[in-house]
Amino acid sequence: ERYERGLADLPVKMNPWDREKSQPNFWLSCMMIDEEAMAPMERGDKDYLYKSEKGKSSPQEILEAISAFGAEGRPIWKPMHLQPMYGNNPFVTVEGNGRGRSNAYIAGSGVDVGADIFKRGLCLPSDNKMTKEQQDVIIEIIHRCFQ
């Protein structure tokens, strides 16, 4: 909740969940950058590339900034169908088999929710020994990434 309050003025969502149908335990603090606030970024299997833009940020930019402070964040878990071992196997989307159509990723057709979460999401430092002051520094670092 502290991250959620501290980042409320940024174009991000913290631990999105259905308040009517679920009750999370919040053991991990995850954040998703709103689509229109995403700076250009590409993630490969072992490396990444991003470009900073005023008013926007990317998960990798934020993770690098947090790391420079000496704290550890990480990307949200990579969906299995994007991992090399499973890359050629079928997967299910809300519209059926994601590998069953040759145009599954053309705008206006298949929606790959897992890939979108992986692209725009990250896990923030979270430890039961983290102080409020340490969390405040992480919140400030994230604000700076959007400037």
Question: Language model features by range: what are they?
Answer:
Residues 1-147:
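PLP-dependent aminotransferase class I/II
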